[in-house]
Amino acid sequence: MRAADGRTSVFKSGVKRLLGRAGFDIVRSTNNLGGVDDFIPFEATMRAARAAGLSVGDHIDEVMNRTPGATQSTIDELRALGVFAANPNTVLEIGPGSGRYLEKTLKECSPDRYEIYETAAPWANYLVDTFSVVAQPTAGCSLAPTPDGSIDLVQAHKVFNTVTFLCASRYFFEMARVTRPGGRIVFDVMTETCLDPAAVRAWASQGGAGHDSYPAAMPRRTCVDLFATLGCNLEASFLAPMGVASTEVLVFAKGA
């Protein structure tokens, strides 16, 4: 995946293998059916964003995912909840992909260190070069290179809707491990809150073919109870747009 030529074929041939690992920024079907067709190609996306006069993140929200303002609305909610008011000195993001949440996070706070775990090499290199973040080596669903209790804010956006239950669960344990006492953990999952009959009907009728585990559901109570056993309590939650329906963003605080 590091070679420039043949990148498209590599992405396509590796889809099934790589979807088992979080960290890719994915795009819904171009007909807005809510299914995952492919990983976002680096060069084509950069060209299209420049041609449209948009940032990469806004281009993905408005043109590719057809959910204009979705990223900013999530950041606005997190700001209102005081997530950035604590001025996190260290931030870790799982699967930043194109960096649309990363870029807006850096407009809200100025951490000394921002770690990323991103398996798409072209995007990881772009984020390192553009935002001076630290790209950690990826291996399955592990954050092993990051020490225990070293991160003030751990976040993952639109990641756990695309991976299996086992992968998400393993990441949950890792997120709690690396968060310092008093730190926060932010991520979204498609919980039962997002799955009323109308939403299920929308996914069934408009969601396209889906792709492997996408869209993956996760019980809200499972997340809340698990993190409670790891010393992390749910502070707040809110819904954010995803595909033809929504996903629930959960904000946890790790006990001091």
Per-range role (PLM):
Residues 2-88, 94-143, 163-166, 186-256:
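Class I (Rossmann-like) S-adenosyl-L-methionine-dependent methyltransferase catalytic domain
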Residues 155:
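A conserved beta-strand element that flanks and buttresses the S-adenosyl-L-methionine
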Residues 158-159:
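Short catalytic micro-motifs in class I SAM-dependent methyltransferases
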Residues 169-181:
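A short glycine-rich, Lys/Arg-flanked "PGG" loop and its adjoining helix->strand segment in the class I
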